[in-house]
């Protein structure tokens, strides 16, 4: 499959709902409130509606209440034929915010099989729950170890390292979800559903880990069981630049006939519809994003909801006007100004 290693969600206060909107429409989320709550009555051209024009049956599934983020209303507006929310599932195992991902996927397989049996073409969105903060009881469902073992004085000892830390809980939760997705794909394959199917996996927003979480992870010394002091020569300072850019989320496009390839071109959520659209034979005239497979020179511009932007060459911080170099080359003012204008146009103008 295709792994996009430089992918960012472009969310505002609507977090998950912003991603569902941006993914579906290739439009930026609202700067005032959230689209799902404040602008749910507007008409949007979406990937769901475009596929329905090609006779796809379109559905969504989520183990949470249907009214959360106004999904029961907005999913219909996006073009879904049916939204299977909490009431469609047996809540037999709860972790974190609700129905566990393991149970969710297990129950989803026969539902998808029935859809596959009744519809020649289908498109489905499955929204998970477990891998979401605060991961309070992660040890109940994940046995993944985030401790660190070392040899001291000829003795093999284990230090706690990330155990019982926020970032450690997150890593354990990710491992659980990874296993759940793997089992889900295996079960779909057993039902013969994967032979002509594309699976898209994305993270709807970053984990919202703090800078202190990263500093602890990078600077923990297992030999002393302490964190390095900032004046230690081995201390890794997490700069504001590093912290702001360490918010990538996964994006994977997989099918049995797609060869494995990593794509590191900067990509945002608004680029999904044009990219998938090129593969599926659909396009939206309102899309603000780009087909990432056909970006000139691989220099895409990722615009964030606060006005900052990222390219393959620089990161521009809108709050203070700072520019952080990414590529080892001289960048002229024209390059910067052009992208500042482009950033404004994404929010306030039509695509040019």
Where are these regions (language model features)?
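Solvent-exposed soluble domains appended to multi-pass membrane proteins
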Residues: 1-352
């Amino acid at each position: 499959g295709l792994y996009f290693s430089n992918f960012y969600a472009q969310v505002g206060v609507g977090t998950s709902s912003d991603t569902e909107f941006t993914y579906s429409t290739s439009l930026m989320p609202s700067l005032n409130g959230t689209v799902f709550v404040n602008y749910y009555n507007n008409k949007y051209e979406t990937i769901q509606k475009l596929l329905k024009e090609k006779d796809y049956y379109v559905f969504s599934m989520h183990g949470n209440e249907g009214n959360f983020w106004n999904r029961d209303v907005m999913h219909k507006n996006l073009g879904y034929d049916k939204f299977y929310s909490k009431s469609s599932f047996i809540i037999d195992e709860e972790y974190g915010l609700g129905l566990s991902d393991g149970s969710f996927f297990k129950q989803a397989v026969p539902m998808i099989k029935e859809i596959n049996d009744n519809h020649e073409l289908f498109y489905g969105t499955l929204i998970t729950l477990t891998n979401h903060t605060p991961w309070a009881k992660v040890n109940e469902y994940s046995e993944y170890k985030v401790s660190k073992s070392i040899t001291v004085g000829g003795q093999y000892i284990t230090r706690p390292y990330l155990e019982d830390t926020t970032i450690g809980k997150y890593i354990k939760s990710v491992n659980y979800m990874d296993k759940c997705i793997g089992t889900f794909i295996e079960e779909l394959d057993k039902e013969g559903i994967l032979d002509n199917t594309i699976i898209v996996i994305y993270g709807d927003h970053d984990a919202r880990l703090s800078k202190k979480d990263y500093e602890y992870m990078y600077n923990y010394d297992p030999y002393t069981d302490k964190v390095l002091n900032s004046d230690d020569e081995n201390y890794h300072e997490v700069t504001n630049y590093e912290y702001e850019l360490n918010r990538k989320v996964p994006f994977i496009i997989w099918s049995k006939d797609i060869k494995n390839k990593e794509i590191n071109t900067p990509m945002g959520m608004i680029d999904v519809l044009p990219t998938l659209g090129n593969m599926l034979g659909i396009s939206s005239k309102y899309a603000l994003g780009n087909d990432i497979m056909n970006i000139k020179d691989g220099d895409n511009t990722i615009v964030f909801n606060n006005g900052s932007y990222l390219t393959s060459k620089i990161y521009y911080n809108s709050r203070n006007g700072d520019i952080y170099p990414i590529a080892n080359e001289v960048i002229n003012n024209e390059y910067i100004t052009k992208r500042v204008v482009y950033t404004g146009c994404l929010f306030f103008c039509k695509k040019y």
